[in-house]
Amino acid sequence: MFGVAKRFWIPMVIVIVVAVAAVTVSRLHSVFGSHQHAPDTGNLDPIIAFYPKHVLYEVFGPPGTVASINYLDADAQPHEVVNAAVPWSFTIVTTLTAVVANVVARGDGASLGCRITVNEVIREERIVNAYHAHTSCLVKSA
């Protein structure tokens, strides 16, 4: 009998220590309130978005220039305007927290420029002076 106790006393001590630790942790969890409570969702007011953002796309160049323009709307969906006379502009008004603003233009004139303005602050502007100019403007977080 002492041979069995002599042989298994270490595993028995480990089992007892693990059991005591489990009971202690369980008691501490109940004392300090770490159990989950379901929130009361019945009284929540809807979140109303305000402070609209005004994103203005502009493509400009010499008079008589015709351009093909691609841009992203407020939902990041691409749109294309073919053979648009410059200067060209498009305004997006949104209450989204972030908008990716992107405009790409290819023109047949000697120069072409693009500009993205957010709430009357110019965030991106590029001008290319080349025949059949190609320009793009990107604001990752408007």
Swiss-Prot record:
It is found in: Cell membrane. Its main location: membrane. Keywords: Cell membrane, Membrane, Transmembrane, Transmembrane helix. The keyword Transmembrane helix applies. It is a multi-pass membrane protein. One of its GO terms (cellular component) is plasma membrane. Belongs to the MmpS family. This is Probable transport accessory protein MmpS1. The gene is mmpS1.
